[in-house]
Amino acid sequence: MKIFVCDAFSSEVFKGNQAGVLILDEKENYPDENFMKNIATELKHSETAFVKKIDNKIFKIRYFTPTDEVELCGHATISVFSTLRTLKIIAPGKYIAETLAGNLEIIVDKDFIWMDMSLPKVEYIFNSDEIKEIYSAFNLDLNQAPKNLVPKIVNTGLSDIIIPIENKEVLDNFIMNKEKVIELSKKYKVVGTHLFTLDMNKKFTAFCRNIAPLVGIDEECATGTSNGALTHYLKDYNIISTKDINTFIQGEAMGRTSTILSKYKEDEKTIQIGGNAVISFECKLYK
């Protein structure tokens, strides 16, 4: 078992979002869940991916936070295939990631890793009373919300509450009520919340912050699945089109700025998330 720490959605070490990557030998079985959870807890990253080669084109991946196994993690998947490319285990081409969220196509090229999201779906649109409850969990009121956008639960592999914010100053300075956010996440059966504001200068698509204390993540500096969900949300409002390549900036408040790309495939239904990752550490487990 080889252990790496990667910085995802960045081309520099100590930027982007860290993920643990454990590569199992081909003849090695997955350890028991408690062991994998303990590894994730010890590494202290928001997600750790355990990857096993099934054949030359198929890799099975399981994802663990310090508290739970989750179906999918975008930045950990980018980290897995960037690591496999760096170690020359794979070459540029198309691959399949077997995950609990389904089998996803991965495209590896020399610059970026592009991964399919699960087909997007809007799971819930909030009413006015629920919207007040959502913003109050971040000590915000409705004056700090755009008038023409409403929070929705969107899923492209994991369910998140997508929360529009009026401007970047508000996004940068909100104060989370942790217990309220946990209650919201339990009540609406979501992994977390993804807050965003559109870039008024139009250099980027949006600035984002991801808050998921229910699964042990107070804030995450890059999230592939959440920005996949945000891509679908923005397309539904005709803010972006299926022809655009979108750029999301996340992690600024944490000092780990990340750049996440998204686009629609030719079918105009499947969303792909793109980015790079670099290995910052290689570790060894003694047992």
Residue ranges with predicted function:
Residues 1-72, 78-287:
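Active-site proximal loop and beta-alpha junction motif in alpha/beta enzyme cores
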